[in-house]
Amino acid sequence: MGFSSLLTTCRYLLYSGAGNSFILGESMPSLEDVLFLCQEEMVDGFLCVESSEIADAKLTVFNSDGSIASMCGNGLRCAMAHVAQCFGLEDVSIETERGVYQGKFFSMNRVLVDMTLPDWKKAERKLTHVLPGMPEQVFFIDTGVPHVVVFVSDLSKVPVQEWGSFLRYHEDFAPEGVNVDFVQRKKDDLLLVYTYERGCERETLSCGTGMLASALVAADIFSLGQDFSIAVCSRSRNLIKIFSEKGKVFLEGPVSLLNRSENFGWLEPKSRRFG
């Protein structure tokens, strides 16, 4: 299979997956590198794309605090776009901590991944204690990483940082903690979602697994049927499409290549290939 790395003249690339921003490299970074790079570029994480014996490539996702995330939906789509362009592929497979994910690269505006898991571990929960004005009923779901979905009537009135931090460390979800998604239903097939991400410890402009979690819970509680299609808008105002078809659930949206490390100003270009 022919391979042409996008990193032949630089060490890192800066990607955005519908507003989720990442540094991408093709060798395993040190913890110090992850912390420095994420802080310097103010990004949500580091994507390490390497060779795989069971897929087109292997992806390791680092949160901006240096911890490893078992899954990142928008990061996975960025990695798929990167690998698709390196190998000249349309169908792409990526090995992750949660198994091998299959995706399809149509264009940078349309990168799709099959996010189906055998068990989403969905459960409605009543919180043991809440902050003033916060709903008591929430929904837990695992879309590769754990999420708590909170439906509200008006997202503009939600203090995302305060409520998000409170729920992320809530004793009901200890010790691992959760990502927190605040959701407003705009139409039958349109959700507005703001996410506080574990590992970033703040609200991010977009979160693929959070948008997926919100759509899956909405499909259940609003009885949208087994085969559904929901558009999800994040803080970045990018739209992600979540749809179910023949028992599988897909995440689809745009990916952008924002910058290369020779333009970052603080790195020397260095050739690097995985494989």
From Swiss-Prot:
Q: Which domain of life is it from?
A: Bacteria
Residues of the active site are 72, 207
Alphabetical GO CC annotations of the entry are: cytosol
Single annotated GO MF: diaminopimelate epimerase activity
- Which example biological process does GO assign this protein? lysine biosynthetic process via diaminopimelate
Q: Where is this site: Could be important to modulate the pK values of the two catalytic cysteine residues?
A: 147, 197
Residues bound to substrate: 20, 63, 73-74, 179, 197-198, 208-209
EC class: isomerase
Q: Quote the subunit structure annotation.
A: Homodimer.
User: Which HAMAP family did the record assign?
Assistant: DAP_epimerase
**Protein name according to UniProt:** Diaminopimelate epimerase
Q: Which organism is it from?
A: Chlamydia trachomatis serovar D (strain ATCC VR-885 / DSM 19411 / UW-3/Cx)
